[in-house]
Amino acid sequence: MNSMNTYSPLYSSYENINIYKKNRKFEEDNYETSTANISCDSKGRILVKESENDRNESIQKKQMLSSMDNRKTNKSEKHNISSYYKMRKKASNHLKDKEKLNNNIIYAKNPHANRYDKYYSLNMNIMNNMNNMNNMNNVNNMNNVNNMNNVNNMNNMNNVNNMNNMNNVNNMNNVKSMYNNNNNSNVYYRISRQNINGKERLLNRYNIMRPQRSADMLIRNYLYNDLPYEINQQNLNKNINDNNAGSFDNLNKTVFENYNKNILDEYNRNIMQYYNSNLKNYRNSSFDNIYTRYNNNNNNNNVYSNNNVYSNNNIYNNNNNNDNINNSFQFSKQEGLMKIYSNNNRNMNDYVVKTSNITRAADNTCAQEQINIPTYNKTVLLKSSPNTENTFNKTLSNILKEQPKRSSMFSFNSSDFFKDFGKLRKNFVGKKKNKINKDIVINGNIFNNKIIDNNTSNAKSEGNSTLHKIYNFIFPSSVKKLQKKKQKLQVIEDKEKNSNRAVVMPLKNKIIYINDANITNDKFKHSFENYNYHQTNIPFVSVTNYMNKDSTKNVRSFSSFDVKERISPRVIRNGNINNNKNNNINNNNNNINNNNNNINNNNNNINNNNNINNNNNINNNNNINNNNNINNNNINNINNINNDFVNDSNINKTVNIHNNNNNLNNYSNTMKSVAKNTQKLSAQKNSLVNDKHHTYHEKLITNIYQFTGGQSQKSCNIKNQNVKEEKINNTQISYINNTAYNDYTNLPNVETYVLSEKSNNLENKEDNNINEKFKNDNNVDKKNNDENNIIKHNVNQNNNEVIVMNNQTEEQINDNKFIKPLNNITGIDPKKKNIYNTVMHINDKMDLNKHDYNYNYNNIIPHNYINSSDKMTNNSLHINKKADDIFQNMISNNDTNVPCVYVNKYINNIFQNNNPSNVTNYINTINMNKAPITIDENSNKLDNNINYENVTKNMIYNNYTNNNVLYITKEKSDNKLNNSTNHLNDLKNNYYVINPSLLYIHNNNNNIEWNKQYTNNFSKPNFLDKFFYEKKVESIQPHHLNQYYYNNQNVKYNPSHINILENKYVNQFTNQNENSLYNFTTHHNNIKNNNIDNILLLDKAIRNQSIYYNNNKGDDETKSAEHTTNPSINLLKNNYEDKNKSNYVHSIVSITDKDNSIYAKNKYAEVVTKNNEKREDAIHKKDEQYIFNNNDNNNDNIHNNNIHNNIHNNIHNNIHNNIHNNIHNNIHNNIHNNIHNNIHNNIHNNIDVSSRENFFQHDIQNTNQINNKTILDITQNEKPNATNEKCLDINNKEKKKKKIKSVHYDMDEILSLKCKVYDELDTCLKCINNLTKNKKLYEQLKKYKHKLDKDTKTKKLYDECTSEKTGSYYTMKDSYISSLLCNEYKLNHILNKSNNKVSDDKHILSYNHHHNKNNNINDINNIKHISKFVNKDNEKTLNNINILNHNNKDPNSGVFLPSDNTESVIYNMNRNRKLCDNNFNVSKHVLYKDSKGTDSTRTNFYDDYSMSYVKSNVDNVEKKEKIKNNINISDKYFLSETDSPYIGKKKALMITLNYNGLLEGCVNDTVDMCDHLMQRFGFNDFILLNDCNLCYRNFVTQKANKKNILSNLHNFIVNSNNGDILFFYFCGYSIKLIDSKFTENYNFALLPQDHSKNNYIYSNEIFNIIKKLQGGKQLCIIFDTTYTSYFVPVPTSITYNKNMNTTEIYKYNNFSSNQKYLKSLKTFGKIRDRNVDSIFVENIKKPLLYEIYKKENDTNTNDKIILVPSIFFFSPDCNDRNDFEFSIKNKVRGLLTYCLGKAIELLKNDFSYHDLFVAASQILIDIKKEYNLKYVKFKLSFLNEYSPDDIKFLSHESLFLKKKLQLDEPLWKPSLKLNNLNQYIQDICNMDERKMLKSSKKKCLLIFIKDIKFYTYKNIDTKNEYFVSCFIKNKNVNILCVRRNNTKEQRIVQDKIFFLEYITLNVTHMENANIYVELFKKKKKNYFVARSIFNIRNVNGKFSLSDEKKNIIGIIDLNIKCVS
């Protein structure tokens, strides 16, 4: 659990304060605070008074002092443990986590030993006595290093001389020369002295100035740490040989190994006692309080150079410029040996700021500038001595083992700690002998007191700036305040002005700081790195030192650097070689010879090891960060690189300043720009609000973070925050290390990797060619450009990088680099992840005043993308820029790098691009990540070749290479659409709200190209909502929906192409006269190639020209028409070649049958191609409209074609469009000709216009009002011409217009090129689709066809009036009733009746083929049938229809039948039946239903192959009909519950709440669940309630406030009908409400959208609504939230036992809970809770009593069995308290919904609720293992009428289940496996069998359990009671088992438990069944102990008991009997 300030407005102040106190308690062991001094504001910010901070500080000081006293007086350490002091820093409120020490502190050598020695004037005799040494006789050697080395019996003084000669320029072997204390050449100083104008200035708090001897320091600081040290030499002697280095190394090693440790321990203890007694202000004896000074050097010119040695000591060399220079080892006593912090521990860092001074020699000819070198506190891991028993041994592994859960990621912006460095410097200069305020210097650091006091938030909030970004994004107003108060982070020193101010660079807190100064002997380095120290994986970093530009000004510069992952030791050195000596530095393997001119006083010119050259990812000797290079004429200087500047997207470490004095001004300017840029970002990161009385915590919203699929949750996917703005001059820009480089054609493909948890550092490979380009790039413009584009410091730090050492190859480096992050969820090697992050700014005319901001709701914007919503610049948005500049500035220099154009603080707003000139509404959400981040390589393959130039060109022409662009042209828009869009515009302009676009939700596997491009994008393509689906267009131009094809990358669309095609077709028609006839032939190649443009234009040409064909060839065409085989006839006769062996006619009706639909589409395309010529012949038959032939044979052929074409169209085309297009063209081409010509015209239209148009989903809705041969064709772009006007009847004047009913389009299916049609298929066609194998049916169809042919002699065409559709346009499969009509017997029965004819459309009540007067009802509700005929005596009927149409204004008042697929025979209302009785005398033939609900739609889902299940039941119904000859249709088809239940519709209520992005996964969960419901289970009625404007397909969303949720739920439950399947889904937050008055009475609640007003949805409110569910309804509820208890009236629940692979039933006891409230575990990182912490609310209404649903007593004794509702409730188990969101495959998902969805995908079609629950639970187990989850378990609750294993999931099977007999508990039964639905219905519904069941005797097993004897007491607790439970399980059956306390609890007596009880088990099948006997331990929760499994055939005996690990622990003795 991370110690984060999880404060939220959703919490109460009390909860927030408790969280704060808990976190502080966790961070600081001794933290205590008073609640009275802490408060919380309304936004969740914690306010702590300063007095409280001061009090805590004083308390902690006292505690630290007392702990030190205890440490000193610990007797147990007196002899065995050395007196290393434990250095604990002051844990104040200021420092908190930044300086909180790890408990694992390694005790270091006391650094105060020098003073102790000096005070007592230790001589050599004392040392000899103490160390038992006999060979140190020379008194003069007491201060010599050799004397201490002689402790190890080293008699050879030459060893020491050799060691000293390394630094001795004069090669002086005289040891006595080292002892000259006057020159202070061998005195080591605690802290560096700065000699300014001959005056001493000390960083000394206590003014202690003691010399330190080299002998003491060598021993105390090096010899006992097993750390070889390196010697620095200011003036290197070229004649140093290898022997000296080797001898010194051997000496050092030997000294350590042979030194007596115990003596040193005793010595150190005496030192501590002395030192502590002399301190006036004794404070923990910390090294931070000790500062020693040194005597002034006699030499005037001293050069002090610091170097970083592995021993954590600074070497200060006092060099005399005279010839007599004594170079000796000078080690500062400053640090001594300190505690060690491991890199993986959290809050362990040191901040010690010291300075040293390097003065310029008087005779320096190069005019070197004075260099001010900062030195840093350093820590190393001390290697334990060989005597492990007597030492305090703590290694890195031990540290990591003790606290493995501590977060290893810790970062902060150290620049906050150095803001007032200049003020401190003034204190030092002006008051050198006065005490420095301890508040200013704390632990060697320099702080601002106010800032420290204000910094009260913990380390996590400070370090993880991403949380600040989120907070700033959500609460941008506070950011404005913070920006006003931000502090300056850097003070740039100018040479002439402000000389007293200091240059402060941001400092990263890292583990080990190595200050290298003047270490030039590579042999030493080599020997050091090859020493055994490299065995420990300790991270090291180097400090880059900066130049001082003025010798008289003391200017400090602080470097910023990273800790690299330790592979092998590495020291990066700063060569500070005097110009006079002409020395060369030989790097280890590089052998880079740099002249002195290139090296003098350039602290940031680093001579790197060869490993840098070996790694392309690390900068080779060239500074790649050329933004910081100040180029001069010295090319060699450019070769110097920053030692810290490894390729890291987050690092802007140092600035290379070369030694030319001319460049110093450039350096100053560059540093200024760095300061300005860094100031912005750092201030944003650690923004503090000062207040006199309170300190404001940065409020962190609960549960906000980002899932990046393998990356840290606190890092963005790619951070291009530091990318500079650079124009793209027709060249591709590559961003390496976030620095823009022009592509010189040598740039390789840049591969980026996920490097660390804290930040995604782009480690890019690069060629040396790039470096060569920049070497020679000395252009002034380039230099200025670089200065102005300094890469800013990234907020996040990286603690997990790799420093590549000497002998590593590039490949090894890459392998080492990818240390798997902790949060790498996907487990994929980051090396394989290609991350491309290109932000494409598309909009060039953004109007910010309208708040048109782009936002995609499918992707809640990750917080790391947002720095500050108010800091957006024009560079980022490209406001008011030219089109050419847009793409040249796609990536700007802004801090933000979001994958969308603009991020506005108004989350609910959506960006809308400006419309094209001809577009009314253009909504485009462009996928900004053209090459999205690839986390799952299998699911997404990127197109890496993105050509920005081409993209730019396409964008200019509005031809976006993006499939989610929808154009709606002005010409095509109808009135309703305009009204809708105007309403949207009003909302946008007045309320700044834009209706969001639909979320693209289907990943269609059939469309490969689409999946390649948009599989795992953050922003799925968006489509418009219902308003833009309802589009009515007559296709004059290419339909707007086909813009998808034109914009598709596969289709190269030229805007002028359509005009060319149009002209091509129009020019073929020479005459434009109305009566002209033309020959027209289609283009075979165009149709063959499926050229969309040509086909659409062909349709247009036909429509525009009202094409008539030449009648000169009429006779020939007539003859050819007789012998032409139409494709539809081939389909009907099944003559065409079909590879499908089953001869199954593939239907394009089914949505779910994807393969069949695509196959049918492709087959149809082939048929169209093969029969193209035949179709052309069919087109020419239109000339027969003027040549009418009365030949009966001709008529038969015509009508044959008519029938077949109708069938063909109904199979392959959209029925709506067929009718409208057919009728439309029919009227256009009809000028009062006879009916046969109309038939021919319909045939041509079917083949040539509608089918082709519908095949390409060119769905166009024409509003048709049909009455007395009247058709009103209303479009905005085409009016009825003169010919059409002639076709209108006189009754047009009496016809009233009805409202336009738009056609809904499935946009998703259009894009995937799937052919979908509406549900109103004819009965005959349903038979073809589903029962093609029935040969008898084909015979019936043929008979029916011949009878229809006879009706062609009729003379008039009666038009059909369309009924208002009440159902969805989505296609569902055939219903239960339609199969009855399709049955062969039923069809034969209907066809044989003379007066009762049912047409091929199921909605036609009847039509008469004979000359009867009163039964002339003609196709009242048919919208698909093309030609219906009546006799001459039909005028009365026609008049009746006119009366109905005139009198009944209500569209529902007319006689019509529902148009949905599954309700085809259960018809509307009794009023319709009465209308039919009064007007048409056909009441006997009206199919009706007794409807309770307002919606008459009924749906059912069956497979194409599942209809056979109902066949036998249909046969039974038919047999009864044969007996009753005179039964009417209504009686025959009225389905009572006894015979076969009514099959209702399926409805879903989906509630989604993401609380402005707090729960990202809810949107994904809802979309995924809707996909399953619609595609798999046939749901077509969705009610969407959400707070994020989520639209699914054409279903419009509503706000998810409390009122809407409760009202919709009430209507959802109450208005349902018997047989309905209801699905209720909720995903969001739940909360526990606790009444302060009644602490024991608590209640759970859901948080709606308006929860801020305390509008909670209480559990009893949901409970009481669901309790109203009655009748034969099935309700499935899924609550994907944490608190789900008592929301649903289901008394029985199931949980899954993974050990048994079975499920366990438990029941609630009157819904009373005795469980204690357990606070859910808050987790951050991989998962996140879906609940809010409990809150206390006053005056909560006491929950109503929960009453379990009880069936009302029914006294009716009829045969109808009352159906009882079945309720199934999926939810997290409240006992395990948690429900989570988690990230998987780069998407955030809810745990429960994801597991259920995956289980649905894995299971077959037939699975029960119990099967689904078991599968989901098993998936959960795998997820829990992967994500290390514990407290998660699912629960399935259900009503006790039926078992979840009885009912199939979301099927109508529950309707056939009858009430079960009450069996004695326990209720055990096997799972009922059905062979087919019909068999199951017969078994359950048969009355005779039911009677037999009542009289039958029960079979049961009596199991007599005697005793259990144990073999072992290993897992047996004799204090607890035990009981035995038994159940029966059949093989291969996943049963529902109920475990009960079937025996009484018994205790163990000796080694046995005696039960002597019977257990009764009810059984149905005795064969192949196993009995499970299990032993449980009785506690608050029963614990499984062991089980025994044996076959049911066994009668008695003893059986072994085995535990979970299958270890036998005892034997159970029992007997079994079977009774009945």
Curated annotation (Swiss-Prot):
> Which segments show compositional bias classed as Basic and acidic residues?
51-60, 69-78
Note the pH dependence of activity.
Optimum pH is 7.5.
Assigned GO CC terms: cytoplasm
Q: Which UniProt keywords apply?
A: Cytoplasm, Hydrolase, Protease
Any one GO molecular-function label of the UniProt entry = peptidase activity
The reply on keyword Ribosomal protein is: no
Q: Where is the composition biased (Low complexity)?
A: 576-614
Q: How is its activity regulated?
A: Ca(2+) does not appear to affect catalytic activity.
**Chain segments carrying region Disordered:** 51-78, 573-614
Q: Which domain of life is it from?
A: Eukaryota
Similarity-based family: Belongs to the peptidase C14B family.
Query: What's the stated role of this polypeptide?
Result: Protease that cleaves specifically after arginine or lysine residues. May play a role in parasite growth and/or development.
What name has this protein been given in UniProt?
Answer: Metacaspase-2
Species of origin: Plasmodium falciparum (isolate 3D7)
